[in-house]
């Protein structure tokens, strides 16, 4: 009984967070600057991970900015840009990217709203597994059916996420291939965000 109540409470909190995000999306003025971002790092949260790069894409004009270890476009400059953004959009940014930035930069205090496409994916497509089995997206491995990962959405949207790190990729060392992978992640997220905005009309 106790376990059931805990599970129900957790589901209720998740649903509340999802609906709050929907309300946030509906209140966004059209002139606000939407920044889609992704980052790559050496590892997981609470493991002393180091950020290798941050890629930002302006959804209004599709311009892309890269912040890495160059003096003129450093990671800390990228962090400051994120703080100034009106709206931050990304896949799993609530669960990973933003906490990782705060872990490394404790003073990080974004002023804008954070919208997580992973949360929206679970809200708008709770039965995505059924859809996958019916449509069978081209080239999509069956292990990704029903998943809300960015890799899975890449197949559904025909905007394939890269495979850096699955074979020879080394996350401990920054490389051009890693940067390309991060840039492609923002491309997939941009298309996913466009889909989520269309789906949001069903909740209006």
Can you say where each PLM-predicted feature lies in the sequence?
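Conserved RNase H-like, two-metal-ion catalytic cores of nucleic-acid enzymes
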Residues: 4-144
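A generic structural-conservation signal
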Residues: 112, 163-164
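Mixed-charge, glycine-rich, non-catalytic linkers/tails in nucleic-acid processing enzymes
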Residues: 120, 162, 168-204
């Amino acid at each position: 009984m106790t376990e059931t109540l805990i599970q129900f409470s957790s589901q209720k909190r998740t649903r509340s967070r999802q609906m709050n995000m929907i309300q946030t999306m509906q209140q966004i003025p059209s002139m606000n600057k939407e920044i889609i971002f992704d980052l790559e790092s050496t590892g997981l949260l609470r493991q002393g991970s180091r950020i290798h790069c941050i890629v930002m894409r302006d959804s209004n004009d599709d311009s892309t900015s890269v912040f890495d270890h160059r003096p003129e476009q450093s990671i800390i400059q990228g962090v400051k840009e994120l703080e100034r953004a009106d709206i931050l959009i990304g896949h799993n940014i609530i669960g990973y990217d933003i906490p990782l930035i705060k872990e490394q930069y404790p003073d990080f205090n974004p002023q804008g709203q954070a919208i997580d496409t992973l949360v929206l994916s679970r809200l708008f497509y709770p039965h995505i597994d059924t859809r996958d089995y019916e449509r069978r997206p081209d080239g999509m491995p069956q292990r990704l059916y029903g998943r809300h990962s960015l890799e899975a959405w890449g197949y559904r949207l025909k905007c394939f996420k890269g495979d850096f790190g699955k074979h020879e990729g080394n996350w401990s060392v920054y490389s051009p291939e890693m940067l390309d992978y991060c840039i492609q992640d923002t491309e997939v997220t941009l298309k996913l965000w466009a889909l989520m905005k269309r789906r949001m009309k069903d909740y209006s």
